[in-house]
Amino acid sequence: TFMAGIDTFDQLSRFLKHVDRAFSGNLSAFEVMWNDYYKLVTTPPSLNQAPLPENYNYYVLVEAMGASEEQNQQALEQALEEDLIADAVIAQSETQRLQLWGLRDDVAQVFQFAPVFLFDVSLRISCMQDYVEKVNKTLQSSFPDSKNFTLGHMGDGNLHFAISVGRDDTQARKLVEAAVYEPLKDIAGSVSAEHGVGLEKKPYLHLVRSQSEIRLMKQVKH
C-alpha cells in the first residue's frame, strides 16, 4: 500500500495505467483524493497526519493484492523516473497502511461545512478533469464561497462530491444538482455510481439514460 502525490490529471491517468501494468491486473485500490479533500482530512480538527506535503493537485492511494514491498518500491521508482508522480510514501506496517486508508475514509470531516450535498457519479476517465472543472465553475458562479470536496475510485470511473454552498433550501439544492448532473448528459455519464438511484436523483435520470433504459430500470425494480 502506498500513496503518491501528483501534479496533473494527465500524469494521474498515466499512473493508473502504469500501476495496473506493474501489478499485472492485481490492483485492488486506486483511490484518488483531490487537493481540497486531502487538505480537509489532514488539518485540525481532523486528527490525521499528512504523509505528503499539501501542494499536489491529486493524491492517490494504491493497493495491489499480494504485492511485495519490493514490487511497490519498483513500481514507484519507475513512476518517478517517468515523471508520473512527484512524491510518494509506502506503508511500512499495518498501522501505517491503516493511517493511509484513514485519510480516504475520513469523509465525516466534510460535515464541518454542513449543510452538505453528497453525490456519486460515474463517467469515463478521459472526461473527468473537464467535468470536475465545469462543475466547480458552475458552482462558483452561483455560490462564490462554495466548496466541493472530491474523491473517487478512479479505476471504476466513480467520483464522489461533498458540496457545501452555505445553505440547503430547495433553490440551492436545484442549482447544485443541475451543476453536477447537467454536464453528464454530453459525456454519457451516470448520476449514480454506487448507491443506486435515490428519489432525489430521479428527475435527472433522463439526462443520462434513454427513455427505454429508464422503463427497463423501472421493470427491474418491480
Set out the residue ranges of the language-model regions.
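Noncatalytic alpha-helical scaffold of FAD-dependent oxidoreductases
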Residues: 1-222
